Amino acid sequence: FNDLNLFEKLLSSIFETVSARTAGFTNYPISLNSISDTGLLLLMTLMFIGASTGGTGGGIKTTTFIALMAATRSTLRGQKDVIISSRLISDKVILKAVGITVGSLLFVLLMAMLLSTTNTFVKKESFTFLEILFTCISAFATVGFDIGLTAKLNHFGQFILIVGMFVGRLGILLLLSALWQALYKSRIDRQKR
């Protein structure tokens, strides 16, 4: 970024911001040497939020994030109702947004803990938790950004990322509700016998 003029910096920033939420393309190699920790945290936040509803990208979706921000704003203002663009948002929608966000956050943290606590690296290289978390969020959001960690994982580590990609694409709430319904149905079937 240092060798770019102001217009190129602005254009590149816009490109990277949009790309972090959708495609994962980059116009410069992502490494911790070229991006500050603050920059990585910003990219991770954008990746975690992800694409808009109806898009093919993963993440929690922009509509979920907007619902959470509106609920936060209403809470801070002491308002009972959550209103977005003159429309009342139901408590059910807010609870769903909270469920998606918390479930997704816990899932990504579980992925990162599995990668950091198990010996999943083929080479005995040391990676920071920030690098591991970046890779897990990128997989969950199906963005495709990589800082060099993925190629150094063994098959178990790569499997964790693959599962993360499926969960991120399908949605944590959909998978948890399907699992819950299957468990609940089998419990009811056993009680009927």
Briefly describe each language-model feature range.
Residues 1-193:
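Membrane-proximal intracellular helices of multi-pass ion channels
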